[in-house]
Every structure is written in structure tokens, then in C-alpha cells.
Amino acid sequence: MATLLRPVLRRLCGLPGLQRPAAEMPLRARSDGAGPLYSHHLPTSPLQKGLLAAGSAAMALYNPYRHDMVAVLGETTGHRTLKVLRDQMRRDPEGAQILQERPRISTSTLDLGKLQSLPEGSLGREYLRFLDVNRVSPDTRAPTRFVDDEELAYVIQRYREVHDMLHTLLGMPTNILGEIVVKWFEAVQTGLPMCILGAFFGPIRLGAQSLQVLVSELIPWAVQNGRRAPCVLNLYYERRWEQSLRALREELGITAPPMHVQGLA
């Protein structure tokens, strides 16, 4: 096992430029047909992917905040599902435009001053508020490495970079309970194995009170909204900053959460 993974881990650990902003890492196919398919691509065999999936799943379950392990799990288990999501985007005018233009979300692409100047209640202002209140940054999303198709690599990168948008849309904080609720919504929306795994096994770390609230109120709400809303990857969020968050929720059929979960863990 160690022998099979050693070349991958060596390239993973020694990969230059891992701290570059997301906007500087375009996901575009090589024109010469040789070498990596996109920036940071690490080609792996099916067996190597299986070993990486098993190891990353164990680490992600042990520590849900190991976003690097969650990222590896998503890339090594979601190939078929990513094709379905890609096809959904291709069939939607807004989604097709996203696939064509490949927008990225990072501090180098966001005009934070403009977002701050937007009216209260707008998507852009509320997204910025979410980042500030929860002390998170869009620059923490790892670049895609193990998806052997450059367009599918962009799809999963886009999913990662709009994750905080989903927190904003659903009104969920970044504590454990909030993350699990978002994972249930994402599991229904995307069908990605890592989302399903996180949705089912994430609650293991919850206390009795939070678990009861999750099962009785928050999971049914997240599942219902996930089924009712159109594919959230088809939203060109960067062109909707000025739209009212309330209006966007109404457009998507997303209702208010049944309770405030900021103080729960």
C-alpha cells in the first residue's frame, strides 16, 4: 500500500505553489494532450484512488474539519456523480455559461469593497457578513488534484467555492450542527458520496440535545429544501450580488430554517 501511494504523496507534498490564490489557478485543458490535464492535477490509478478514498474517509470522519481530507474524498469517489452534475449545468443556460467562463471565488476575484457597499439584505452583503461573522475565507478551498477530467475538475472546484454561498442561503453557521445541515442539503442536491457520508456520519459527534433537534427538525427541513430547489451549481452568484437574499430564496424555494442554530453544537 505504501509503495502504491508513495509517488502520489511525494507529488502531493512537494507540489509547488499550493498557496496561490484560486483565481491564479484556471482549470483549463492542456492543448498538447500530454502531462497533467490542468494545474495541480495528479494522475492516479483506480487502486491508488481507492486507497486514497479509504484513508481520507477515515480521517474526515475522525475530524470533519480536515478540509484537505474531505477534498480528497470528494475527488476520489465522485466521478460518476460529477458527470451528472456537469450535464445538469450544460442543460441550463446559467450553468452552461459558468462552465464556459469558469469563474473562481477567492479574495483576489471578489471586490470586497463593492460587497460592503451593497444594500443590507442583498446576497453580496449577506455573504460578506457570513464570512466576517464566522471568520472564514474563500481562499481556504483546496485546488482539485485527483479528478482525471478537466471539466469535471472545475465542477467539483465550483462546488467547493460556492459552499459558503449555501451556508448563506440556508442561514447556517459553521459550527458542527450547521455544517451537518448543509451537508444534508448538499447530499440531496448533488448526490456526491462525500456529502452523503458526511450527512450520515457527521451526527456521531453531536450531543444528545443537538442530535434530537437535528433529526426531528433540521434534517427534514434540509431534505425538503434540497429536493425543492433547482441545482445550486447553476447559479452565477457573482452576477447576483445585488439581488435580495430573500428574493433569491423565494426563487429557489428555500424556506427559513425552523430554528436558530448558532448557539447549538
UniProtKB/Swiss-Prot annotation:
Please state the protein's primary subcellular location.
mitochondrion
Which biological pathway? Answer: Cofactor biosynthesis; ubiquinone biosynthesis
InterPro entries this protein is in? Coq4, Coq4_euk
Q: What is its EC number?
A: 4.1.1.130
Q: Outcome of altering residue 158 to Q?
A: In SPAX10; likely pathogenic
The modified positions for Phosphoserine read: 108
What pairs make up the disulfide bonds? none
Q: Provide the top EC class.
A: lyase
Question: What positions does the entry give for Zn(2+) binding?
Answer: 163-164, 167, 179
Q: Topology versus the membrane, per the UniProt entry?
A: Peripheral membrane protein
Out of the domains of life, which is the source? Eukaryota
Oligomeric and partner information: Component of a multi-subunit COQ enzyme complex, composed of at least COQ3, COQ4, COQ5, COQ6, COQ7 and COQ9.
Name used for this protein in its record: Ubiquinone biosynthesis protein COQ4 homolog, mitochondrial
- Highest classification ranks of the organism: Eukaryota, Metazoa, Chordata, Craniata, Vertebrata
